[in-house]
Amino acid sequence: MSRPEVVNSVAALRAQVSDWRRDGLRVAMVPTMGALHEGHLSLIRIAREKAERCVVSIFVNPTQFAPSEDLDKYPRQLARDLDLLARVKADLAFTPTVGAMYPAGFATRISVGGPSAGLESDFRPTFFEGVATVVAKLFLQATPDCAVFGEKDYQQLCVVRQLCRDLDLPVEIIGAPTIRDAHGLAMSSRNAYLDEAELAVARRLNVILHKAAAALAAGTHQDDATGEANRALIAAGFQKIDYVEARESLTLAPWRRDRAGRVLAAAWLGKTRLIDNVDVPVA
């Protein structure tokens, strides 16, 4: 299996996409920060089903990290990533430098309202501004017909959809199911930070969220269901809970019982912050 072609300039990216367009080919994109795992590969497989050509960006975006977060520690392993991209037959890897994405004098930020309110934004107030800005740039650079994002980062998926609607970006946003290990833990590049004991605790997160979702579907009051989930997470060994909340699936507005919903959570194990979400069936 051969590795995909690698380009690190916007000009080279646009030239390749233009060649595909001249041949009448549909183009999909999967934005990533590298440190690829099976969750990412599942997104690329979906992209390959939706289009004849697939661009995967690998860029650790500094604007979505707060000063106290793990930008410097975030795993960077391009050679391994390219080998994995070969397995799923990605056509092009776009690996820009920070200087190429944010050259001297760069002064624009995109702020998305609506689904960005609360949840992650309460604890990472600059995160979605960084996400929206880099995603808009990537879409303008690659001009994909569609892009695939995982439901594991559910609020991010909703924010990207809002971004494309509001700015008339002609990109179809495809949400992909969360990929989990055999014990139900959502796959994440940050799982590599966990030791064996922490992994055992981390695998309780999905179980506890499913119990909360089932309780909500059965008629339990929101505060009772999410409060019990908070207590269960602490009892399981999580040191701190940032949030456990029920929101409407489409808008992330506060959940109403007659609407499809999601239970979303963020919790800490040592220095590692984990997020996950599960759906709440309509009653």
Curated annotation (Swiss-Prot):
User: Subunit info?
Assistant: Homodimer.
Q: Which organism is it from?
A: Mesorhizobium japonicum (strain LMG 29417 / CECT 9101 / MAFF 303099)
- Superkingdom of the source species: Bacteria
The encoding gene: panC
Task: State the UniProt keywords alphabetically.
Answer: ATP-binding, Cytoplasm, Ligase, Nucleotide-binding, Pantothenate biosynthesis
Q: What is this protein called?
A: Pantothenate synthetase
Binding sites annotated in the UniProt record for beta-alanine: 64
Question: Gene3D superfamilies per the record?
Answer: HUPs, Pantoate-beta-alanine ligase, C-terminal domain
**What PANTHER family does the entry give?**
CYTIDYLATE KINASE/PANTOATE-BETA-ALANINE LIGASE, PANTOATE--BETA-ALANINE LIGASE
Q: What is its EC number?
A: 6.3.2.1
Q: What does this protein do?
A: Catalyzes the condensation of pantoate with beta-alanine in an ATP-dependent reaction via a pantoyl-adenylate intermediate.
- Which residues are listed for ATP binding in this entry? 33-40, 150-153, 179, 187-190
Q: Which residues cross the membrane?
A: none
Q: Does the keyword Cytoplasm apply?
A: yes
The residues responsible for catalysis, as annotated, are 40
- Is the keyword Cytoplasm assigned to this protein? yes
Q: What class of enzyme is it?
A: ligase
